[in-house]
């Protein structure tokens, strides 16, 4: 018996209940209670299940049933609310401009689909007279796209009127519109387009009339009378020589006859003052001597009227007073070509103009 009792006790103790565990372990009980108390003080209590789950509320069944009943009752009544806007759409009447668009040969997208202004009026439900009057004006833009075909008689009369007066007063415009079987708007638009065409034509004609001013300015720049005012420096002197080459007939005769001094003296002074010009005049690209036979063969040239005395011995005499580079070019055996000789003579004439 004792064995069985102990066995039973051991069986019971082998599977203790939760209450026995809590009573046998007071520390666990205290920690459980204190932790639950702390959590209850720190964390706000959650809402009751009745609030989180409305169906658990005592009156939820009674409240939700009426809602469901109301929804069931409103369900068949949902289509009727859209019909109120539908009756509002017919109040927008069909204006004449709508019919014109539909009957036009090239119907635009606005003819098939209502315009924004027309759709805005039914949506807002405002049928004021001002909005109704504004619709034809909005559609007037579509009507203006249609091109008006004027007859020859109408064009002739309009051109005649435009010739006398480019701007029409309203009484005259009404009179012409009635005479030509046109609307006042068509006459006004035709005159606007005709004025723009006239403006373009006059603008294209003006540039040719204003062009002659440019050549005159160029003539003033290239006037040979301003050449003596050039400075004796190298670049300006070379530019003057180049301009003298461009106008040899105008420069050479007057230059040679204006200064009675011998050419040798003039050449010596020019070589001492501006060696750059003298070097270029002496054929800086292909230097060579000035033999006597070259001048004898070129005496008939109009550019050499006063060079008969310019012989080889005079060149040797002049070489002493010229720069070393010019002297070397005179001693070179390479002969001058005719083009280089012409350039040389014209350069000498330009130097005479700079140093009178």
UniProtKB/Swiss-Prot annotation:
Molecular function as annotated in GO: DNA-binding transcription activator activity, RNA polymerase II-specific; DNA-binding transcription factor activity, RNA polymerase II-specific; RNA polymerase II cis-regulatory region sequence-specific DNA binding; sequence-specific DNA binding; sequence-specific double-stranded DNA binding
Location relative to the cell: Nucleus
InterPro entries assigned: HD (IPR001356), HD_metazoa (IPR020479), Homeobox_Antennapedia_CS (IPR001827), Homeobox_CS (IPR017970), Homeodomain-like_sf (IPR009057)
Sequence ranges of Low complexity compositional bias: 106-136, 227-240
Region Disordered, annotated ranges: 39-142, 197-240
SMART domains: HOX
Compositional bias of kind Pro residues: 77-94
DNA-binding region boundaries: 143-202
Gene Ontology biological process terms, A to Z: anterior/posterior pattern specification; dorsal/ventral pattern formation; embryonic skeletal system morphogenesis; facial nerve structural organization; morphogenesis of an epithelial sheet; nervous system development; neural nucleus development; positive regulation of transcription by RNA polymerase II
PTM-bearing positions, type Phosphoserine: 274
Coiled-coil stretches noted in the UniProt entry, renumbered to this chain: none
Residue ranges with Polar residues bias: 52-66
Pfam families assigned: Homeodomain (PF00046)
Taxonomy, superkingdom: Eukaryota
SUPFAM superfamilies: Homeodomain-like
Record keywords, A-Z: Developmental protein, DNA-binding, Homeobox, Nucleus, Phosphoprotein, Transcription, Transcription regulation
Motif (Antp-type hexapeptide): 94-99
Position of the signal peptide: none
PANTHER family assigned to the protein according to its UniProt record, in alphabetical order: HOMEOBOX PROTEIN HOX-B2, PROTEIN ZERKNUELLT 1-RELATED
Family (UniProt): Belongs to the Antp homeobox family. Proboscipedia subfamily.
Subunit and interaction comment: Part of the nuclear protein complex gamma-globin promoter and enhancer binding factor (gamma-PE) composed at least by SATB1 and HOXB2.
Name used for this protein in its record: Homeobox protein Hox-B2
Species per Swiss-Prot/TrEMBL record: Homo sapiens
Taxonomic lineage: Eukaryota, Metazoa, Chordata, Craniata, Vertebrata
Gene (name only): HOXB2
């Amino acid at each position: 018996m004792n064995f069985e009792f102990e066995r039973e006790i051991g069986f019971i103790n082998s599977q203790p209940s939760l209450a026995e565990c809590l009573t046998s372990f007071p520390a666990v009980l205290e920690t459980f209670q204190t932790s639950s108390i702390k959590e209850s003080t720190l964390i706000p209590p959650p809402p009751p299940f009745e609030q989180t789950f409305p169906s658990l509320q005592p009156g939820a069944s009674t409240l939700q049933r009426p809602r469901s009943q109301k929804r069931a009752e409103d369900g068949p009544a949902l289509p009727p609310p859209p019909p109120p806007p539908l009756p509002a759409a017919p109040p927008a009447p069909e204006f004449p401009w709508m019919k014109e668009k539909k009957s036009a040969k090239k119907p635009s997208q606005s003819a098939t689909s209502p315009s924004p202004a027309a759709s805005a009026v039914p949506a807002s439900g405002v049928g004021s007279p001002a909005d109704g009057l504004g619709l034809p004006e909005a559609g007037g833009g579509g009507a203006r796209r249609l091109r008006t075909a004027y007859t020859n008689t109408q064009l002739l009369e309009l051109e005649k009127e435009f010739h006398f007066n480019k701007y029409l007063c309203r009484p005259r415009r009404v009179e012409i519109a009635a005479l030509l079987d046109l609307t006042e708007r068509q006459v006004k638009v035709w005159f606007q387009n005709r004025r723009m065409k006239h403006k373009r034509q006059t603008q294209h004609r003006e540039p040719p009339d204003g062009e002659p001013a440019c050549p005159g300015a160029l003539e003033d720049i290239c006037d040979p009378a301003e050449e003596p005012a050039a400075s004796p420096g190298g670049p300006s002197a070379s530019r003057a020589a180049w301009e003298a080459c461009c106008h040899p007939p105008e420069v050479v005769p007057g230059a040679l006859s204006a200064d009675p001094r011998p050419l040798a003296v003039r050449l010596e002074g020019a070589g001492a003052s501006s060696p750059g010009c003298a070097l270029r005049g002496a054929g800086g690209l292909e230097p060579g001597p000035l033999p006597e036979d070259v001048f004898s063969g070129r005496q008939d040239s109009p550019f050499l009227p006063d060079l008969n005395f310019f012989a080889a011995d005079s060149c040797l005499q002049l070489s002493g007073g010229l720069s070393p580079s010019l002297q070397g070019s005179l001693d070179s055996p390479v002969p001058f070509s005719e083009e280089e000789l012409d350039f040389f003579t014209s350069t000498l004439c330009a130097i005479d103009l700079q140093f009178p």
